[in-house]
UniProtKB/Swiss-Prot annotation:
Xref: Gene3D superfamilies: Leucine-rich Repeat Variant
Organism: Drosophila melanogaster
Transmembrane residue ranges: none
Biased composition (Acidic residues): 37-51
Protein name listed in UniProt: Armadillo repeat-containing protein gudu
Tissue-specificity statement: Highly expressed in testis.
GO BP, one annotated term: sperm individualization
Length: 669
């Protein structure tokens, strides 16, 4: 007999322990112990009380005759001979096994144990029949978990060694469903199943490019096997460990080949695998070097929305690299992306909209891409999406706008399209990535005087300032950077700052932050606010000098640049110059001149010029060896750097002359 009764289940278990070669150690550990060793295997094995209640309700409903007929067939499989088993399996397939009640019929009578047991037999027809049933019923999450508990994964993986294509196809189809359980994904990897599945998708390019109705029966079998393998790999790619194993098994060139297929049912799962893998840096590079970008772009114009979603999301994840962004433009990928976001029928498809807007955002980082997007009136289409209810979509939209408005023409376009009020209203959101992009975009808009007038009318400066209270450091940093042009370009900016209760206290308080980006942005904001003498007096009362002095030992060039600018702005009030010298800030600031960044040189020279107003500071600078650096800066093409360096040298020289005159006077006396 092919099937077993409950009395022989112990023998079957012992037989598996002795004969399973795919996973020799899988019986040496308790499942819970295995799960604890790998983060990919954490799975809630028990259903909630609510789930159990709904199962009971489903069973308690009027039970159809098919339920009992299916259970009779399972009994025949258990007790029948080989022929009866095959016939019963074929009859079982005639029922709709995708319905829950029919799935219950199999599991309630112990049919899952029987089906898994059949996978061990040597009769290929029985195995094929069992796999066909399993591939249908494993759409049910509880059945998937049961298959894993019955140690079915190693048996299915072993079948991938078969020489029969249809058997391997059904095994891969079953794995595609069962591996939605995390523990199953680990078992496939540890049993060596990933290289076998990768082998399934190694197919001739001629088959991929030939329409299905023109393929021979053997080629059709190969195509179906490839599709099943692609589906299984798509499910397995939810694990980082599996993705790395897939890469080592040589999946990258095979993915590139499958993307050229004319068969949508093959392209969709492999595009999904590309999308999942593109979150890994090693895959991002491989996707570019294998020339996948043009093929991904070609599918963006497909009629299939799932394919467009997978493709646009893959570009979104890969376009962090400048080379990839250029390839997208050269392949004509920007046009279909804009076509997607302006299609009103896409608005309800959030995954597709999220992928397309994200891809546009990443591509807009490159200036050449922005020029193409301008020709497509992309800013107008993005503004139309600012009323979307999905935070992820809004994050991508505002991110794309923030990159586009780096150019003055797009600031005007955004203003004319009515985008500013919509962006300002979103400042009340609690989604940190969205707030970060809003701050970046409004910072660029504040550079435009006309846009700044609108922002003032909308009370945007107060809302941006309030973002400094946000617990996310990146939001704090970009908000502080956005404050700079707002203060610089606002009407009566000095009074505007003072009208915001607690505004300067909030800024100075952030100098205690541990985040370099926040500190740098806050220093830039202080340098701007301190341009007004009244505001500078308030900052001085808030002990800003002491907090700045605590930061001078930094080695970060961005912080050095903005810190030096803040020191330059604050030094010229009261006795701040002398106090900064007393706090031993001069020598560390002189070391900033060793930086390779000319912007650091400029702000450092400006700070040193202000500090050199105090004679003691001049002496310290001279002893620190600042003169050669200043002489070199005088030859710079940057006028501000030239003037600041010359001013500092003048102050040092004047002190030296006064000292020389004093010594001569003493000698004369």
């Amino acid at each position: 007999m092919i099937g077993t009764s409950s009395g022989t289940s112990h023998n079957r278990s012992r037989k598996k322990k002795e004969q399973c070669g795919s996973c020799p150690n899988r019986f040496s550990k308790d499942k819970r112990q295995v799960a604890a060793e790998d983060s990919d295997t954490t799975e809630v094995e028990s259903s909630t009380d609510e789930e159990e209640r709904w199962k009971e309700v489903a069973r308690a409903a009027e039970i159809p005759a098919d339920y009992y007929n299916i259970q009779k067939l399972v009994k025949y499989i258990k007790a029948g001979n080989q022929t009866a088993t095959i016939v019963s399996l074929c009859c079982l397939k005639d029922y709709d096994l995708s319905t829950q009640i029919n799935q219950f019929a199999i599991s309630d009578i112990g049919g899952l144990d029987v089906l898994v047991n059949i996978l061990e037999c040597s009769d290929t027809k029985c195995c094929l029949g069992a796999l066909k049933v399993l591939s249908d019923i494993t759409l049910n999450i509880d059945i998937r978990k049961t298959i894993v508990d019955l140690d079915g994964i190693p048996l299915i993986v072993d079948i991938l060694n078969s020489s029969m294509k249809d058997l391997k196809t059904m095994a891969a189809e079953t794995l595609a469903n069962v591996c939605k359980v995390r523990l199953a994904r680990k078992y496939v990897r540890t049993c060596g199943g990933i290289p076998k599945l990768v082998d399934l998708i190694d197919i001739k390019l001629s088959i991929l490019k030939t329409p299905r109705d023109q393929l021979s029966p053997d080629d059709l079998e190969s195509l179906d096997m490839t599709r099943a393998g692609a589906r299984a790999l798509f499910t397995l790619a939810d694990s980082k460990h599996n993705m790395e194993q897939m890469r080592k098994s040589g999946i990258v060139p095979l993915m590139a080949q499958l993307l050229k297929s004319c068969h949508i049912d093959v392209v969709i799962p492999i595009m999904g695998t590309v999308r999942k893998c593109s979150s890994e840096p090693k895959f991002q590079l491989a996707i570019t070097t294998e020339g996948m970008i043009p093929d991904i772009v070609s599918h963006l114009s497909s009629e299939n929305t799932e394919l467009k979603m997978e493709g646009s999301t893959a570009i979104y994840k890969c376009a962090f690299d400048g080379t990839t962004r250029d390839l997208v433009r050269e392949a004509g990928g920007l046009e279909p992306l804009v076509t997607i976001i302006k299609d009103k029928n896409v608005r309800e498809n959030k995954p597709l909209l999220r992928g397309a807007t994200g891809a546009i955002w990443m591509c807009a980082v490159t200036d050449a891409n922005v020029k193409v997007l301008d020709q497509l009136r992309t800013v107008n289409h993005l503004v139309a999406l600012l009323n979307d209810e999905c935070d992820e979509v809004l994050t991508n939209v505002t991110g794309a706008i923030s990159e586009c408005v780096r150019f003055q023409s797009n600031r005007e376009q955004l203003r004319q399209a009515g985008g500013l009020p919509a962006m300002v209203s979103l400042l009340n959101s609690s989604h940190a990535p969205l707030l970060e992009n809003l701050a970046k975009g409004l910072k660029e808009c504040a550079e435009d005087p006309d846009s700044m007038r609108i922002l003032e009318d909308l009370d945007a400066v107060r809302l941006i300032w309030s973002l400094l209270k946000n617990p996310t450091t990146r939001v704090q940093a970009h908000a502080a950077y956005a404050i700079c042009p707002c203060v610089r370009n606002a009407n009566d900016s000095a009074e505007l700052v003072r009208s915001l209760v607690g505004a300067m206290e909030l800024v100075v308080g952030l100098l205690k932050s541990k985040d370099i980006m926040v500190l740098s942005a806050v220093c830039a904001a202080i340098a701007t606010i301190a341009q007004d003498q009244t505001n500078l007096a308030i900052l001085t009362d808030l002990k800003v000098i002491y907090k700045l002095a605590d930061l001078v030992q930094t080695t970060d060039d961005l912080l050095r640049m903005n810190l030096a600018a803040a020191v330059a702005a604050c030094a010229c009030f009261g006795n701040n110059t002398e106090e900064l010298g007393r706090l031993r800030t001069v020598t560390p600031i002189v070391t900033y001149m060793t930086s390779d960044n000319p912007l650091v040189h400029r702000s450092t020279a400006m700070a040193l010029e202000k500090l050199s107003m105090d004679p003691q500071n001049c002496i310290t600078m001279h002893q620190s060896g600042v003169v050669p650096f200043l002489l070199e800066c005088i030859g710079s093409t940057n006028k501000e750097l030239q003037l600041a360096a010359a001013g500092c040298l003048r102050n040092i020289r004047e002190l030296a002359l006064r000292a020389e005159e004093y010594l001569l006077k003493i000698d004369d006396d």
